[in-house]
């Protein structure tokens, strides 16, 4: 009976995601649609790349005028474009049967919906490994998969969606390694995550560093007689295997970039040159004003532009070109949710440390996960201060998975607190969990069908 109910919930979990994601993916406009601006951020500029691949059957170098963003003077094709390659070649196949612009756009967007669906499945696998209580396991799964902004990322043409899938793969691989030990299966999971991350999104490269550090540390073992030993043989065996798979997966792209872009592996230097040459004055690197160039401090930037508030609200949910927001109560509810999670996580750490000594391996694992949370935050603030002010919460989404793990673990520990030997009654805990589910699922349904859908229906699927 329990297995049957598990399958039902799992099916509803995936179908709910698909219903919400497809509603957005099939109805939101592509081109700028003032004054409502229901179109996703920069999708029209990103979509140029799969369109180019569909038309010519080859990957653009990023130097072609056809894929250049007119105002900014550079192309997203200079960056890692693996998701666009997948979209472009599938579009090329679909174009054999129809030349409909709508069908081709849907094809590209549905690739990212598929990435989101795969991520939802892996999040379910992670939940099974880290939560024994079914209630909190499902709360974790829904918190990750149904966060409005996270779901939104899987509905339009971008590289963020593939990146989020890659972070789930890497976290799952690390959990399996630390629970079951290293083997070929876990090595392939890790390799796949690293490949997708390396070929999709720079902001998540911290996960690759974390994977390397945690992999190397795994082979450091404490001996019963005291001291430590290191299994060099096994580390080299699996390390070389993972490195070989990763190099096969990503080597072609960086070799190509080195040749095509005159040694510019990441495309950043070429982007700078193109922006200087072609960008309009307001966004040209030579004339563009940043908070750093104007002599402001980071804290003055925070105070003047409400940076942290903007990041939080758009991390929870901001559809369109950051033009469609949820109810104010949605963001207030998430503030309470995160506050409860943080307090619970800290209490858990204090009480857990009092009961038993935390091993060095556990400390190192959690420090790495915290690093994966804070690195995207640091990079977002750094770029906003030094390069181009954009306090968009979507840049923080690589931190979503470990962040939600600690939040749900914290809420779980809050529910287990005892006073004079007495714990909260089960009905009260269940009521609290139900409220969390209401915030997560109800808030997302409200965002999609009450806030966003009327905008999409009013503007229509504008293609150009």
Which role fits each region the language model picked out?
Residues 176-179, 207-246, 260, 270:
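Perimembrane helix-loop-helix junctions
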Residues 237-345, 446-451:
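Membrane-lumen/periplasm interface segments of specific transmembrane helices
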Residues 186-202, 248:
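Membrane-interface alpha helices of multi-pass inner-membrane proteins
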Residues 1-28, 220, 231-245, 350-367, ...:
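Start-transfer (signal-anchor) and selected internal transmembrane alpha helices
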Residues 5-43, 52-60, 242-259, 374-378, ...:
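Transmembrane signal-anchor helices characteristic of membrane glycosylation enzymes that use polyprenol
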